[in-house]
């Protein structure tokens, strides 16, 4: 008999929970139990500079605001750790334009 995966908070209409894996240098949201994930990847490109490189949300979950939660978590991490950020990812560039908070803008690298 197959075991059903318990529904994620997202599927139940609950809050979106972003996890930060510092070792893998990624932020993620579990979408379907432990199988599907939305991710935001970053790399350190200097001692205090991170490159926010790529955001990916599976097609079936797009349009639900998941990428916004990932972008906010990553930018809040930059602020909390007093880092600078280079924005390679087009989505994070768009997020900052739509949310031009001073604490984000002052940490951007060209």
UniProtKB/Swiss-Prot annotation:
UniProt superkingdom: Eukaryota
Database matches in InterPro entries: Acyl_CoA_acyltransferase, Gcn5-rel_NAT, GNAT_YJDJ
N-acetyltransferase domain mapped to chain residues: 19-109
SUPFAM superfamilies per record: Acyl-CoA N-acyltransferases (Nat) (SSF55729)
Tissue occurrence: Expressed in the heart, testis, kidney and lung.
Stated family: Belongs to the NATD1 family.
Name of the protein: Protein NATD1
Gene: Natd1
